[in-house]
Amino acid sequence: MKGNYLVIDKRVLPDVYEKVVFAQKLLKDGKVKEITEATKIAGISRSVYYKYKDYIFDFAETSQGKKVTFNLIVKDQTGVLSGIINYISEQGGNILTINQGIPLNGVANISVTIDMSTLIGDIKTLLNGLSDIQYVEKIEFVAME
């Protein structure tokens, strides 16, 4: 794996990093043509943009052709696991491994690893959709490869 990576919630980072991602998005979407214009709109200097542009990416951009592992805490109800599997399949995810622990105190832990290369959307959309499934109590991102 090239480099050393961390997944960090953007709420704990200085605003400058999110502004670099915003400038990248302006350029990628064709809303601006020049870096100078993108950095001005984003509120950062060109030197800041050039310093970080090759090292900061939106989480969704890193999901092509990768594997992701996440844990779900679900209520012990009939059909929850099949609902999760069906949703992942509908979104184009390829399940590589799935493990469910024995339910204790009415809840079970499920660990899922999927290949994201065929996802219809991005990983954020997938995880948000999974959290909307009835009886899914919590989703925790574990790792991305």
From Swiss-Prot:
* InterPro entries referenced in this protein's UniProt entry, alphabetically: ACT-like_dom_sf, ACT_dom, UPF0735_ACT_dom-cont
Q: Which cysteines are joined by disulfide bonds?
A: none
A Pfam match: ACT_4
**Gene3D superfamilies the record matches:** 3.30.70.260
The record's section on PROSITE patterns has:
ACT
The record, for CDD domains, names: ACT_PheB-BS (cd04888)
Q: What SUPFAM superfamilies does this protein's entry cite?
A: ACT-like
Q: Which residues form the ACT domain?
A: 69-144
The record's listing under HAMAP family reads:
UPF0735
Q: What family does the entry list?
A: Belongs to the UPF0735 family.
Protein's UniProt name:
UPF0735 ACT domain-containing protein CLL_A2896
